[in-house]
Amino acid sequence: MKKNIHILLAATLLFGATSCEDFLQKDPPSSPSQSVFWQKKSDFESALAGTYSVMYSGVFSQIMPCLDGLTDNAIVQHSEGTYGWAKTIAQGDLTPNQGGFVTDIYGNCYKGIARVHILMEQLDQYTGSDISADEKKFMLAQCKALRGYFYSWLYQCYKEVPVVTQSLDLNTMNQPKATRAEVLNR
């Protein structure tokens, strides 16, 4: 009898746990999907903060302030672990095979530009009443300023880079390099 109760209880738990479809279809709260994001003003503010956060990544927060060490305004004497590639660049030892400084600027700038474009596109489509027209204009102005900031670094470091004007997908991700004038005007 006791054995039958255990089997019945196990079967009930087994079938009860697998019958709930909603149980397995939850969106993770730490990384919401596009279908549940962009529903309210705080989502747009979070996305804008995420775009600003690119400016606090290693290359922008640690290496960029040390670029005076590449001029006659300062001297770079610290190890690579302290200030990234500034000493290597100052000594003229940076090669294309080294990662870090060169690739981080490129990647982080385009990460920021991608976030800007996604935010601008979603803001353009948003019809909620919790964001006023003035707030939309202000957010768009911040997006354009951030995009200009990222392109200014790309221009300073690379001159001719792809100019991205919208979110990219698999069909549009291979963009040609733009001329220096196009990058500068962006």
Predicted features and spans:
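Terminal processing/anchoring signals of secreted or surface-associated proteins
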Residues: 1, 20-22, 51, 116, ...
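Short secondary-structure capping/junction motifs at helix and strand boundaries
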Residues: 2, 62, 129-131
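Short, well-structured active-site flanking segments
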Residues: 27, 155-166
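Short, solvent-exposed turn/loop segments enriched in Gly/Ser/Thr/Pro and often Arg
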Residues: 62-77, 82, 154-155, 162
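Conserved, well-structured interaction surfaces
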Residues: 45, 53-58, 82-158, 172-185
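Short, charged/polar, low-complexity loop and linker segments
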Residues: 168-170
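Membrane-proximal, proline-rich intrinsically disordered regions
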Residues: 20-71, 174, 181
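Bacterial Sec-dependent N-terminal signal peptides
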Residues: 1-29
